[in-house]
Amino acid sequence: MRISLKWLRELVDFQLSPEELGEALTLAGFEVEEIEDRRTWADGVVLGRILAAEPHPNADKLQVCQVDLGSDRPATIVCGAANARPGILVAVATPGTHLPALSLTIAKADKRGVISEGMICSLAELGLEKSSEGIHEFPPDLDLEAHPLGSDVRPLLGLDDVVLDLTSTANRADALSMVGIAREVAALTRNPLRLPPVQPLQAKPIPNFQLRIADAKACPAYSGVLIEGVKVGPSPDWLKHRLAAAGMRSINNVVDITNLILLEWGQPLHAFDWDRLLQVMGKKKPTIEVRLAQPGETLKTLDGQTRTLQADSHLIVAGSQPVALAGVMGGEETEVGSTTTRIFLEAALFDPAVTRRSARSQGLRTEASTRYERGVNFATLDQARDRAVQLILELAGGAVAGLTTFDQRPPLERTLKLRLSRLIDVLGDEVQAADVEEILSALGFQLSRCEGANSQSALSPATETATVASCVWQVVVPPYRLRDIEREIDLIEEFARLYGYDRFSETLPTEPQVGSLSARETFTRQIREVLRGIGLTEVYHISLCPAEEDGSLVRIANPLSPEYSAVRNALLPGLVEAFRFNWDQGNGPLQAFEIGRVFAHALPPNPHPYREAEHIGGILGGDPNPHDWQHRNRPMDWFEAKGLLVSALERLGFGPEFRLDPPEEQSSLLHPGRQASLWIEGSRIGLFGQLHPRLCQEKGLPDQVYGFELQLDPLLESLERRGIVQFVPFSPFPAADRDIAFFAPLDLAVGEIEKVIRRAGGELLQSVQLFDEYRGQGVPAGQRSLAFRLVYRAPDRTLTDAEVEALQNQVRAQLATQFPVTLRS
C-alpha cells in the first residue's frame, strides 16, 4: 500500500518526519519497505513561459527558445521537442538542478554553438511517465497569481509529496486504505482523526428495477445508485496527483473517483454505463443478478481479454449476460466512457473465499480482489458509497435518480473480556491499567470496567495483587477490526505493539528449566527409531486429497483447489502412491513408513461431527536385493513382511495377535485372502496385508507389495495400562518340548488354533510355533495337516514327564472340543 503523506496529513495531524513515521509504523507492525521522496524529482524545476521559438541555426531538429522565468531577462534554452512553441507554460530545469529520473545534473551547455541555460522538461524526464511525446504543457488558464512564473512546479505536478510503501499482515485488511493507516497514525501520535465529510444518501428506489442475489453468503450486501446527467471528462489535478502517488493512472473523473474511494476507504466500487447495461438487457425488465457462472458463459473484461468463465467464477449479470467478474474486474461492454451520461454505481460486499476462487479461476489479481480477499470492512460500505456519490455529483455533475439495496450483513458487534493480570503475565510488570485504557481507546476500542473491578488505575503496593486480579475490562471491538480481533490475546498484542516492544524489560529465567517430552512424543520417537531399525525410510505426505463422490472423506469448507478439497482418512493410499512414484522413476521398491493424522466422520453417539487420530502406516515389498550378483529374483514374501512388522512391535514391547476379519470389514486396498487385523490385549490396533492384485495392476507395481496401518492411541493406552515394566528373571531349569499334529479345515485360521493352545497350556506353556503345513496325498479333501511345537518350562523347577503329558492332554482335549480337527499325535 502506497501512502501519500500529503493526503495522510489531511486525515490526521502529525509532526513526524517521513523517516520517523516510517520507523513508528514499522515498529507498530506495518513494515515500510521504501520511502519515496517525490520532492527530489523536480527540486529546482520552475514554471516558465516560452516567448519565442526559432529554428536552431546549426541543427534541423532543434529550436532555440526564449523562456520567461519571471526574472529580468528571458533564458535561452535549446529544445528538441516538436510541441515547443510560443505562449505555452512549461516546466524548466534550471542550471544546478538534479533530475533523478535521468541521473543528470543540469548545467549551462553549448548546444551546436548556442549556449543553453536549462532544459524544458517532459513528464518522463521528471519521473512521472515511462515515455512522453514531448515537453509537458500546463493548462493555459493556470492561475499565475497563485503560481507566478519562476515558482516551484512541484505543487502543480503533485511532486510536493513523500510516499511510504508499506506492507501489512494478511489479517489487517483495514490497513489497505488511507483511513485505516490514518487510524494507526492517530493512535501512535494521540492526535484526533479527521474522516472525510460524508452526506448520507437519500434516494427513492430505481423504478421498474429488480435486484437478485443468488447466495447471500457470497454477497451479503449489494447497493446500486443510478446517477443521471453525468458529464465524463478529465479529473482535476488534485485527484490525478493522489492516484499517481498511489501508482494508479487517471482514466476519467468517474472511474478515478471509484479508485479514490478504494484507496481512501478500502472499499472497491464499480461504475457501469447505465445505457449500455440496458442495451445488454434488451427489452427485458432491468435486472441485476449476482450469481456463479453457468457452463459456456464468457466475458470480455476491461483488459480486453475474452474470458471463458469457470463454475466458481462469481458474476454480476445484467439480464442474462455477464457484465463483470464480481469483486475482480468489470466488463468492457458496459464500461464508462466519454459518451456516458448515466451511470449505475455498484458498492457491494463479496465473500473473501468466493472472490479468491473467482480471481484464481481467471488468473487475475486486482486492487479490488486483493481487498475483497482480505475482507472489506462491513461497517463502512454505506459511507464509502455516499462519499463516491458526493464526489461524482461535485466533479461530474448529474443527480441521483434511484437507489437499490440488498443487505444481509451479520451483526457487527463483538465484546471481549480483558484481564490486567493476563496482560502482566504475558508482557511483564511494566503494564499499567492507565496505559491499557489510553492505548486501546486510541485504537478505537471501547473499554468499560467490569462490575466490582477496582476503578483506580494506579496500583498501590499494599493492594497491588488484589487490584490486578480484579481489574477486568469489557472491550467492544470496533467494526473495522472484527476480522482480526477475536480473543483476549489479540487485545494484548494490540496494546503491546503500540506501547512498544522495546519498552518491556528483558526477564531471564531465575532457575534452569529442564525440558521434557510427553509420553506420546517419547513413544512416537521410539516408533520412528524402531521402524528405521528394520530398514524403513520415513516419508511425509500432505494430508489434503481430492474428495470422493460417495462423501466418505471429510470435505474442507474453503479448499484451495479440487485436488485439495478433502482430508485423508488413511495413510496407506499415500504410501502406495509414493511406492508407485519411486518404482516408475527406476528407484526400486520403496520400504517406507509414515506417522501422521487422519480424519473421518464421527459415528454416534459422538457429539462432534468429525474425529481425527494419529496413525502409523508402512509399505514394503518387491525384491529387496535387485542387484544380487547371483541374479536371483526373490521378492519379499508374506512371512518376511509379517516378520518385520512383528519384530518392530516386539521391540516396542507388544506381542501382536493376527485375526482374519469378516469380508465386510476388510480393506479394499488389500488382497481379500491375504490380510489380517492386528490385536493387542483385546484391542484392534490396525491391519496388515498384501496389496490387492487389481491395485498393483492399475498402478504398475510388483505383485508382492505389503502394507500396514496401525493406530497410535491403542498402543499408547496399552503402555499406560502396563505401567512400569518389571524384570522377570530367566528360568534356569530346562524346557520340555512336545509336538502335536492334526488335520484341520482349510478355512480354520492358524491364529485361532494358537489362541486355544495357549489358553489350554496355561502359564507353563512358554511358546507355540507352527513348524509344518502339508496339503496333498494322505490328507482328506478340504483339509490340511498342521504341526505345532509346544515348549513348556517352569520358573522354579524341572517339569516331570507326567506334568508335561497332563498339559499336553489338556491341549488335545481343547482342540478336539473347539474345532473340527482330527488329531494325529
Swiss-Prot record:
Cofactor binding, per record: Binds 2 magnesium ions per tetramer.
Cofactor entry: Mg(2+)
Encoding gene per record: pheT
Subunit structure: Tetramer of two alpha and two beta subunits.
tRNA-binding domain mapped to chain residues: 39-154
Family: Belongs to the phenylalanyl-tRNA synthetase beta subunit family. Type 1 subfamily.
GO molecular function, one term: tRNA binding
Protein name per its UniProtKB record: Phenylalanine--tRNA ligase beta subunit
